[in-house]
Regions:
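Surface-exposed loop/turn elements that mediate protein-protein interactions on large endomembrane-trafficking
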Residues: 1, 17-37, 62-89, 109-123
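Short hydrophobic interaction/assembly module
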Residues: 43-69
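Beta-strand-connecting loop/turn residues
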Residues: 19-20, 52, 59, 103-104
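Repeated scaffold domains used in trafficking and secretory/extracellular systems
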Residues: 1-12, 36-52, 78-103
Length: 123
């Protein structure tokens, strides 16, 4: 498996490549989609224990739903494939880590040690 792995699960892994985070299928080592872009690089990532979503953090956070049709992340685009927050317009938060605390909740830790809980709505 390549270097710069941010997270992995049974069937997927997320690899950091400069400011992008890309999802790969372990079967065939195949690129699936870009799941995030973070100014200053992605700091951390989790893949949901049920492989329903992944979350990348750094400059803000991006929750990307792991369901077809997979499409490459594009900043500011409104889509059902992902949602993002704390990424600009005067509300930028720098996150250092993310962890899953329940099947539908994640906990983000910012650069000052502050915690934020986010509920992931799955459609």
């Amino acid at each position: 498996m390549p270097q710069n792995i941010l997270a992995q699960s049974e069937n997927y892994y997320v690899k950091a490549d400069y400011e992008t985070a890309e999802l790969y299928a372990k079967d065939g080592d195949r690129r699936v989609a870009c799941v995030g872009e973070h100014y200053g690089d992605a700091a951390d990532c989790i893949i949901d224990s049920g492989e329903r979503f992944c979350v990348t953090v750094g400059c803000g956070y991006i929750v990307y739903l792991l369901k077809p049709p997979f499409e490459d992340y594009a900043s500011g685009k409104v889509t059902a494939q992902w949602f993002e927050s704390d990424r600009g317009n005067g509300s930028t938060v720098w996150y250092d880590s993310v962890r899953q605390i329940s099947p539908s909740q994640i906990e983000l830790t910012d650069e000052n040690g502050g915690k934020k809980t986010v509920t992931v709505g799955l459609k």
